[in-house]
């Protein structure tokens, strides 16, 4: 759910990809970015994934790296330095060209818009959201984001109707209040929001508009 970096002396090796290699050792399948991944700038995010991939075997990590998912983060400026205005038409799950970490400036992260995994006979679709509050902490970033509720509606419908998924999960770095607002705006296609950013533990799942969090 993001914030896999920061908080310990391990952060000194962030751009070397140490935290990502630790996720691989834990056999984490998917992850997304939180605000702390941007603490030393956008380029550091790409550097960490490039170096993790390059140094995996050197550091004795034999499990594959997690798949990075990014679904609502876009390049903020065009080649002329002018701000880019995005609309709902720019939310295109099958098109990596607008994804800043897919085919944009930091494509070497290897990020994808979404992923599909077969689990216990079920077809599970996943995508990822960066929240408004979380992204407000990313002071060094030249990226922008689109509204989580709007992106979630498009991706959830796409994964259910076009990709035939039985279950759709949003990996979120938004915080519970934003996640609840996202859940209330859904149309019955999103099943689960895997919540992060708050760093809180919940004894029981929270259900909003049929979405489990």
What would you call each of these model-derived segments?
Residues 1-213:
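Acidic, metal/ion-coordinating pockets
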């Amino acid at each position: 759910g993001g914030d896999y970096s920061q908080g310990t002396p391990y952060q000194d090796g962030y751009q070397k990809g140490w935290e990502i290699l630790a996720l691989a050792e834990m056999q984490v399948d998917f992850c997304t970015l939180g605000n702390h991944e941007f603490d030393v700038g956008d380029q550091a995010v790409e550097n960490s994934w490039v170096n993790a991939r390059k140094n995996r075997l050197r550091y004795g990590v034999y499990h594959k790296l997690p798949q990075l998912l990014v679904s609502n983060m876009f390049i903020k400026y065009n080649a002329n330095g002018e701000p880019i205005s995005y609309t709902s038409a720019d939310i295109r799950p099958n098109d990596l060209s607008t994804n800043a970490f897919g085919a944009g400036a930091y494509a070497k992260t290897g990020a994808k818009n979404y992923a599909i995994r077969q689990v216990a006979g079920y077809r599970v679709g996943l995508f990822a959201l960066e929240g408004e509050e979380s992204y407000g902490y990313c002071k060094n970033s030249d990226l922008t984001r689109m509204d989580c509720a709007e992106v979630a509606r498009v991706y959830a419908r796409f994964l259910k109707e076009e990709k035939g998924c039985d279950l759709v999960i949003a990996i979120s770095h938004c915080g519970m209040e934003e996640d609840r607002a996202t859940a209330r705006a859904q149309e019955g296609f999103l099943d689960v929001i895997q919540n992060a950013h708050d760093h809180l533990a919940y004894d029981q799942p929270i259900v909003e508009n049929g979405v489990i969090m």
